[in-house]
């Protein structure tokens, strides 16, 4: 795998049986003991992920809050210090440049966590729109490693090696300078699995030690390292969207049912606001729906959705759900076919298989300490 980047944890994958693939230009483990085993481990116990390939950008300065609001669809004004917000960053047409997390450290200090596959594009977009805003933008991606501990036992495990009461960190809140196994880290109660859990940001040189410390701390509870395969099935079951599948620069947040994160009534302008106001007024012409395959087969990304011989959309993500044990998927279809109960076909390997539209919230589990 020449010319691929590596994370600070690259050296530990084989130690745990990791199978390496190219993901977003990085050598990353697709699985360790098998993605089904790993999926159930996170749902029932806890799993540890290397997510150091994600990007991190610091935005500071007198106009930091105004600048972030100009870039984002969500209402940045509601963020208090040490809180986290999920948002979209859109182009002028309302298409999604990226979906990301905004961490507010202080009034003029924000930390953006961006998707690995969009790092270069996002940083350029942010820099290109700096204009007259009095801000400093620093790409911190290469100087930060990130681990995610996810699952119902995550708090119990992590509590053993931190110097604070983790109950202090509520859902979508953060704490800086937490000592994790003696190393200073940023810890947030966030994740991409539909389970309770934490994301831990540390110095690259501390990542291996923390990886081993967390796995050792959770031995009794059955914690396991988790690869990209289970990461995708977990997020999919929880209806957490994946950039490049459910959204891209030609798809808007409104089309994928994420209008809650688009605050069109905020006083300030943001990039794409006018286009999204227009789209909301006129109504979307396509929608993201959940579906269940009624015939035997597995739907995959890109498969056509067909109604009465006409292509009405495409599958964005599809799997045989490990938790629900049935073939389900997400599809972007013409609006008139998006109602729950609507029947259509999915073209799987030249065969049209019957499917029915269902609620896309396939799996929900209340996150602790809301």
From Swiss-Prot:
Pfam families xref list: GCV_T (PF01571), GCV_T_C (PF08669)
Q: What Enzyme Commission number(s) appear in the record?
A: 2.1.2.10
Q: Which InterPro entries does the record match to this protein?
A: GCS_T, GCS_T_bac, GCST_C, GCV_T_N, GcvT/YgfZ/DmdA, GcvT/YgfZ_C, TrmE/GcvT_dom1
Class of enzymatic activity (EC top level): transferase
Extract one GO BP annotation from the record. glycine decarboxylation via glycine cleavage system
Superkingdom per UniProt: Bacteria
Reaction equations catalysed: N(6)-[(R)-S(8)-aminomethyldihydrolipoyl]-L-lysyl-[protein] + (6S)-5,6,7,8-tetrahydrofolate = N(6)-[(R)-dihydrolipoyl]-L-lysyl-[protein] + (6R)-5,10-methylene-5,6,7,8-tetrahydrofolate + NH4(+)
The keyword Transferase belongs to this UniProt entry's keyword annotation: yes
Molecular function (GO) terms for this protein are: aminomethyltransferase activity; transaminase activity
UniProt key word Transferase: yes
UniProt keyword terms in alphabetical order? Aminotransferase, Transferase
Any one GO cellular component localisation term in the record: glycine cleavage complex
Describe the function of this protein: The glycine cleavage system catalyzes the degradation of glycine.
Q: Spell out the family assignment given in the record's similarity comment.
A: Belongs to the GcvT family.
- HAMAP family, sorted: GcvT
Quaternary structure per UniProt? Answer: The glycine cleavage system is composed of four proteins: P, T, L and H.
Which named protein is this? Aminomethyltransferase
Q: Which organism is it from?
A: Clostridium botulinum (strain Okra / Type B1)
